[in-house]
């Protein structure tokens, strides 16, 4: 299974996944895919945006560190993470606290 780090570093995670892998791991991959596909649009990622003249760039190294701790994150409430993102929660921590209780 490809990891979030592989995706951010350029590995084509979507094309390379087999249907059986998606069925087996999709629940864990889906939140990360959602985060990556919407990262530029969501206000909760404003802390991860490095402003450059004329463009916005996401600080992917910092995002990887925060989303990929040493142990895997188990997303328990995928619908909640989607709702919080679409409602533009202020901080990524708010979303992760709801979705990934420790």
UniProtKB/Swiss-Prot annotation:
InterPro entries: Y'_ATP-dependent_helicase
Name the record gives this protein: Uncharacterized protein YFL065C
Organism of this sequence: Saccharomyces cerevisiae (strain ATCC 204508 / S288c)
């Amino acid at each position: 299974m490809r990891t979030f780090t592989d995706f951010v570093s350029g590995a084509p995670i979507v094309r390379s996944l087999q249907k059986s892998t998606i069925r087996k791991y999709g629940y864990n991959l889906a939140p990360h895919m959602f985060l990556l596909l919407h990262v530029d649009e969501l206000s909760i990622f404003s802390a991860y945006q490095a402003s450059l003249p004329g463009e916005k760039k996401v600080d992917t190294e910092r995002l990887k560190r925060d989303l990929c701790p040493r142990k895997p994150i188990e997303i328990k409430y995928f619908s909640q993470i989607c709702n919080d993102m679409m409602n533009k929660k202020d901080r990524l921590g708010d979303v992760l606290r709801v979705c990934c209780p420790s």
